[in-house]
């Protein structure tokens, strides 16, 4: 065992703090670089391996960039509101504020022990009034611009958490938090109009340095599609409804239409004899989430209303059904069905014995879903694809029964939560004035501490008379406060702005400061946030830009996702499986740098993998080996026998490995390919060890090589490297020095090893100068003592020279 361990960690953490090494100065030289890891939720008392895998390697990247001359801003904070703390309070009786702040205290200590260069002076905690005051301000600004509104809507309701869930928080019909089956419930809720920015959210994606998969997920979630909205009239009625379709060329093949169970027309369209069946079906549909209802693997079901609609293009009468695979919140809440040319419609029609009419030629069997010439389409027969669409839309336009339409899958962002532990929505309701925004000077609307937060389906804040009753800011009369709280994603939708100016008590942020520091240059976090946090933050940035507060379009210029660290059994870590890894235990045994380097060397950063105790032991042995080599190097430099001043073969070999390492550690670290970067450092380590075995060493050259070695190692093992840097005789931090410069000339070798073959079989190897001609290489090969002996008495027919690689001799 070497000397490295937590004692060294603590020594350097103290020195860094005392010297203010990691304090950020916006006026310091160097190009600004805003590096941000997604802040953690303090739902547990300790950081887990996943936190470390996000924060440790990203800090190494930030240190690397600092040594490359960047002025790095790397803040840290806590996403402190949310359900887990409230659920923990319900279970234990410990108040969410108390448990959250205690957890934050523990996690701050752990984050400091990591040795990351976080700018703690810029810390934010979203559950504190000095932060959520400004979350409320953001909400009010959206409200002023008409981007926040209230409406009655069917929502996802978790009966266990007793709160509304956004669509993104429902996984396969279950609550992502507690796995309960999600139900549908009609409630008056607050929404943010993210749909106003649908086009820009889509169009600006391609210009971002983000993983393609994440961009594809956002594109799918926004779901822009160009099609046609056609109007169907209900038979013997004044009622009409619209359907949206991207395949208007198949309109003649419509044999039935389907309405969402929640569609307000269903009750008026359902005949008396069908009412019982339709009502029963509606009740069942309420138990399903939107995502579950649209699952491609789930069998589609429906029930007939008893009414008929008229196809606008051919006048045919088609039955009106109710089906839960149609959503009231998507498109018009009504769809036309063309079973001959749509797989879902075909399965539904076959199940319920509904007509199937081919209107497109092609394919050996139905359903045929490609484009083709129209048949059974009257005046449109023979038309193909876009030509057919144009002709049909023209007729619909003439009859005022349809037109071109762009549709989106994206829905407005539901932000109301019927829970306690969140930012109160800054709105009051007055009998005289209606809905009134709380004036900015009255912010924050603070959460009361003494509250009954046991869930019963009502907002806990509604049970606090002190909180509930207030004065109307407009008329001075009695008013009641909004008792829902904001979705925690509202808090995290703008936090990257507050970091820059976190102590500002007059504004959410200083406009000049934010526009100087933003956007975030490198953002690192999990891919699970693709359609929630990452989308919401983009929306809020654009909204604040349009209000004049920001001068940039996107919050995060470059995005990197870390992979997942699994348990030793290869499964996702969980307490119930007993496969969790406690970083503190390993840090205590091996030190923070061994833990950090294991995470970076043991896994491809974007992929992750299964934890291995054997692998972290191997990394500990490697650090011990480095410590021995560096100690031996210092001894050799002090030894008077080492008098060499020339650069000869041994020095050239080490210099080659040195610059090869500089080149590839630089390139790989830049791309977050830490495992291969550390592999190059390991090769450099072996070359150093080999050089130390030389009889006479060039001490000046060795010191240069060691200086570059420690610099290369520093971002990956910051405490250990600072210690070795000091032992080398330096008085300033290694992180105030410049990154080693790669010299391409060092990779041009004076000699190269070649193989010598006879009749295609290798018989010898030899080193030759790299500047020899083919004739000189041939002569050198034939004069090799081993080859001369093997060729004795033989006739040389031909000698083939492959420069820099081999010589093949053909002889008989």
UniProtKB/Swiss-Prot annotation:
GO BP terms: leucyl-tRNA aminoacylation
- Sequence motif 'KMSKS' region, location on chain: 572-576
Binding positions (ATP): 575
Name the Enzyme Commission number(s) assigned to this protein. Answer: 6.1.1.4
Gene3D superfamilies for this protein:
3.10.20.590, HUPs, Isoleucyl-tRNA Synthetase, Domain 1
Q: Which SUPFAM superfamilies match?
A: Anticodon-binding domain of a subclass of class I aminoacyl-tRNA synthetases (SSF47323), Nucleotidylyl transferase (SSF52374), ValRS/IleRS/LeuRS editing domain (SSF50677)
Where does motif 'HIGH' region map? Answer: 40-51
Top EC class, one word? ligase
Superkingdom of this entry's organism?
Bacteria
Does Transmembrane helix show up as a keyword for this record? no
Main location per UniProt? Answer: cytoplasm
Is-annotated flag, keyword Aminoacyl-tRNA synthetase?
yes
Q: Which family does it belong to?
A: Belongs to the class-I aminoacyl-tRNA synthetase family.
**Name of this protein:** Leucine--tRNA ligase
Organism whose genome encodes this protein:
Clostridium novyi (strain NT)
Q: Which gene encodes it?
A: leuS
């Amino acid at each position: 065992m070497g000397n490295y361990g937590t004692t060294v960690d603590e020594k350097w953490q103290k020195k860094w703090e005392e010297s203010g090494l990691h304090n950020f100065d916006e006026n310091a030289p160097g190009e600004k670089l805003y590096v941000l890891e997604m802040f953690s939720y303090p739902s547990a008392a300790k950081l887990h391996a996943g936190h470390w895998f996000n924060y440790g390697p990203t800090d190494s990247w930030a240190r690397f960039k600092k040594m490359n001359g960047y002025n790095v801003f790397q803040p840290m904070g806590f996403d402190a509101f949310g359900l887990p703390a409230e659920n923990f309070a319900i279970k234990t009786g410990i108040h969410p504020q108390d448990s959250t702040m205690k957890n934050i205290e523990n996690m701050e200590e752990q984050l400091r022990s990591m040795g990351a260069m976080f700018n703690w002076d810029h810390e934010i905690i979203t559950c504190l009034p000095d932060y959520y005051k400004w979350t409320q301000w953001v909400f009010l600004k959206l409200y002023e611009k008409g981007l926040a509104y209230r409406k009655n809507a069917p929502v996802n309701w978790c009966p266990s958490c007793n709160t509304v869930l956004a669509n993104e928080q429902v996984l396969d019909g279950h609550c992502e938090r507690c796995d309960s089956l999600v139900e549908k419930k009609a409630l008056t809720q607050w929404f943010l109009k993210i749909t106003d920015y649908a086009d820009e959210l889509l169009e600006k994606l391609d210009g971002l340095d983000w993983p393609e998969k994440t961009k594809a997920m956002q594109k799918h979630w926004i779901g822009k599609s160009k099609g046609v909205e056609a109007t169907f009239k209900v038979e013997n009625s004044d009622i009409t409804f619209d359907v949206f379709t991207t395949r208007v060329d198949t309109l003649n093949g419509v044999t039935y239409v389907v309405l969402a169970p929640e569609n307000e027309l269903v009750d008026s369209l359902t005949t008396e004899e069908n009412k019982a069946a339709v009502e029963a079906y509606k009740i069942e549909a309420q138990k399903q989430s939107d995502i579950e209802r649209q699952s491609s693997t789930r069998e589609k079901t429906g029930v007939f209303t008893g009414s008929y609609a008229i196809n606008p293009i051919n006048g045919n009468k088609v039955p009106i059904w109710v089906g839960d695979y149609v959503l009231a919140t998507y498109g018009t809440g009504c769809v036309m069905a063309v079973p001959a040319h749509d797989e879902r419609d075909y399965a539904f029609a076959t199940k319920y014995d509904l007509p199937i009419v081919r209107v497109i030629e092609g394919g050996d069997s139905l359903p045929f879903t490609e484009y083709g010439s129209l048949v059974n389409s009257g005046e449109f027969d023979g038309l193909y694809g876009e030509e057919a669409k144009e002709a049909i839309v023209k007729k619909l336009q003439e009859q005022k029964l349809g037109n071109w339409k762009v549709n989106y899958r994206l829905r407005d962002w539901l932000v109301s939560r019927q829970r306690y532990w969140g930012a109160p929505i800054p709105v009051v309701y007055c009998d005289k004035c209606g809905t009134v925004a709380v004036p900015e000077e009255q912010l924050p609307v603070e959460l009361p501490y003494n509250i009954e937060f046991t869930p019963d389906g009502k907002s806990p804040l509604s049970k606090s008379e002190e909180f509930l009753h207030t004065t109307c800011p407009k008329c001075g009369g009695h008013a009641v406060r909004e008792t829902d709280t904001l979705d925690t994603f509202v808090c995290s939708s703008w936090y990257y702005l507050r970091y820059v100016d976190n102590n500002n008590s007059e504004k959410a942020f200083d406009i000049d400061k934010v526009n100087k520091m933003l956007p975030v240059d490198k953002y690192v976090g999990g891919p699970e946030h693709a359609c929630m946090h990452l989308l919401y933050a983009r929306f809020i940035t654009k909204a604040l830009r349009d209000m004049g507060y920001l001068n940039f379009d996107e919050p995060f210029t470059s995005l990197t996702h870390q992979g997942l660290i699994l348990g030793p059994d290869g499964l996702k870590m969980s307490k119930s499986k007993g496969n969790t890894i406690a970083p503190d235990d390993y840090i205590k045994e091996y030190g923070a740098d061994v833990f950090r380097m294991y995470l970076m060397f043991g896994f491809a950063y974007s992929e992750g993998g299964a934890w291995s105790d054997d692998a972290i032991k191997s990394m500990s042995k490697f650090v011990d080996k480095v410590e021995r080599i560096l100690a031996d190097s210092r001894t050799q430099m002090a030894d008077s026998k080492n008098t060499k001043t020339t650069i000869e073969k041994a020095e050239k070999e080490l210099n080659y490995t040195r610059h090869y390492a500089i080149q590839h550690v630089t390139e790989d670290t830049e791309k977050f390919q830490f495992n291969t970067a550390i592999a190059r450092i390991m090769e450099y380590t072996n070359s150093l060890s080999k050089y130390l075995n030389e009889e006479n060493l060039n001490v000046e050259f060795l010191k240069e090589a060691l200086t570059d070695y420690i610099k290369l190692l520093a971002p990956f093992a910051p405490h250990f490297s600072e210690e070795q840097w000091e032992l080398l005789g330096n008085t300033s931090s290694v992180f105030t020095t410049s990154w080693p410069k790669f010299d391409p000339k060092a990779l041009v070798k004076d000699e190269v090893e070649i193989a010598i073959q006879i009749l295609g079989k290798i018989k010898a190897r030899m080193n030759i100068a790299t500047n020899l001609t083919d004739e000189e290489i041939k002569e050198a090969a034939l004069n090799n003592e081993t080859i001369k002996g093997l060729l004795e008495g033989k006739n040389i027919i031909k000698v083939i020279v492959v420069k820099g690689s081999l010589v093949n001799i053909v002889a008989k």
